[in-house]
């Protein structure tokens, strides 16, 4: 189980990312459309003044059950440990062991 503080920190990052996403997108569009270097530099400074945790790359995918940040399958939102346990317990419909 992951630390509660790490899970809460990731929730805060998701909230900030959603809050500043429109503003960040508008600034990036203005940067692409601007012609002068001075204007671009000013817009880059405004973009950099946004909170660091509002960037979408700072968000970590975590397991829904354990909060584990590594080895998380996107299709299920579960870590490999929980995925294996749930698949063996037949809690994931349509998932079968591979055999060839």
Swiss-Prot record:
GO terms for molecular function: rRNA binding; structural constituent of ribosome. PROSITE patterns: RIBOSOMAL_S14 (PS00527). Pfam families: Ribosomal_S14 (PF00253). GO terms for cellular component: chloroplast; small ribosomal subunit. It is found in: Plastid, Chloroplast. One of its GO terms (biological process) is translation. InterPro entries: Ribosomal_uS14, Ribosomal_uS14_bac/plastid, Ribosomal_uS14_CS. Binds 16S rRNA, required for the assembly of 30S particles. Belongs to the universal ribosomal protein uS14 family. This is Small ribosomal subunit protein uS14c. It comes from Staurastrum punctulatum. The gene is rps14.
